[in-house]
Design a protein with these regions (language model features):
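N-terminal secretory signal peptides that target proteins for export/translocation
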Residues: 1-6
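Bacterial N-terminal signal peptides
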Residues: 9-23
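N-terminal pre-domain segments of enzymes
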Residues: 26-78
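Sequence context surrounding c-type heme c attachment/ligation sites in exported
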Residues: 26-29, 91, 109-305
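Short alpha-helix capping/helix-loop boundary micro-motifs
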Residues: 84-89
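Short, well-ordered loop/turn sites that connect or cap secondary structure elements
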Residues: 94-97
């Protein structure tokens, strides 16, 4: 059984690395240079680092990604006169020129990650590292780096390489994680009314879709798995493993109890060949573990195979 588990982990790891390598080669081909400083990406108003740039809006996903206890803030900007194509409710298509930012903090801002959809239809990924005084943020090396940060696990903070960013984002249903019908909650009806979405179900104007589930514990666990595992385990490409943890608007995805136990086991370890997610986390998430245990406590023993 241990040999099978290690083969499974190796398959996932190699698939992730291959996806990142291919995507990195595509991104590097004739791509314009990334801005050297965060303020040149448009997040802030010109000359006013305490004010958001024109058209930039904050948002908060209902089910956030675990990031080793870091606090996060997120923003999005759509080009004027454009809207997100939501005709496929689970695979939104963003207009060229879309920009997104995510700030990671441990008592102070440490890094801000940046996504931009170019005119060529290719997503570009970058990370900006903040100065200790929080006044400026500069482009990090493409290979990433490790910082000494008070409050981070063991005082060390790993800024991901661009290949690491690509490994998670390019294997997902959409390269944009955390922005979708099941994540925006009550922001979704507002976005509909403001014209930020097109070709979306009219019912979203009044009410956002909810995760499937009989109990609140089940819905909470599904949401956690969707946000933390579903970008790879979605059954439409991603990793070549028969495990679907992404949820969809129709509520079709339902992992078997035995799969839930395996997901919990991998969430609870940081052994390199076993841990899930395989990247960007060095300590398990106690809240996520508690959510899965609460759901499993409600599953009849007879259904666990």
């Amino acid at each position: 059984m241990n040999a099978i588990r290690r083969l499974y982990a190796l398959t996932v790891w190699l698939s992730t690395l291959l996806s990142a390598a291919v995507a990195a080669a595509v991104q590097a081909s004739a791509a314009p240079a990334l801005p050297e400083q965060l303020h040149d990406t448009g997040l802030f108003a010109p000359g006013q680092p305490d004010m958001l740039g024109a058209g930039v809006e904050a948002f908060e996903p209902q089910h956030p990604l675990w990031s080793d206890g870091a606090s996060k803030r997120r923003w999005i900007r759509l080009p004027p006169g454009t809207a997100i194509d939501a005709r496929d409710p689970d695979r939104w298509r963003f207009p060229h020129g879309t920009k997104l930012w995510k700030e990671f903090s441990h008592g102070r801002p440490v890094e801000t990650r940046y996504l931009e959809l170019g005119a060529d239809g290719q997503w570009r990924f970058a990370t900006y590292v903040w100065s200790a005084d929080g006044r400026t943020a500069r482009l990090a090396p493409a290979g990433g780096l490790t910082l000494s940060v008070e409050g981070a696990p063991a005082g060390r903070y790993v800024v991901p390489s661009r290949d690491d960013c690509l490994a998670c984002h390019t294997g997902a249903r959409s390269p944009v994680l955390g922005v979708g019908a099941l994540q925006l909650g009550q922001d979704l009806p507002r976005w509909m009314r403001e014209g930020r979405l097109r070709d979306a179900p009219p019912a979203w104007r009044e009410r956002a879709p909810v995760l499937a589930g009989v109990t609140e514990a089940e819905r909470a666990a599904r949401g956690y798995l969707h946000a933390n595992c579903g970008h790879c385990h979605h059954g439409a490409g991603g990793v070549p493993v028969p495990l679907v943890l992404a949820q969809d608007v129709a509520g079709n995805a339902a992992p078997a109890p035995a799969q839930l136990h395996e997901a919990l086991r991998r969430m609870s370890t940081r052994e390199p060949t076993q841990q899930m997610p395989p990247l960007s986390t060095r300590i398990p998430d106690p809240h996520g573990q508690a959510l899965l245990r609460a759901w499993l406590d409600q599953v009849p023993v007879s259904s666990i195979r």
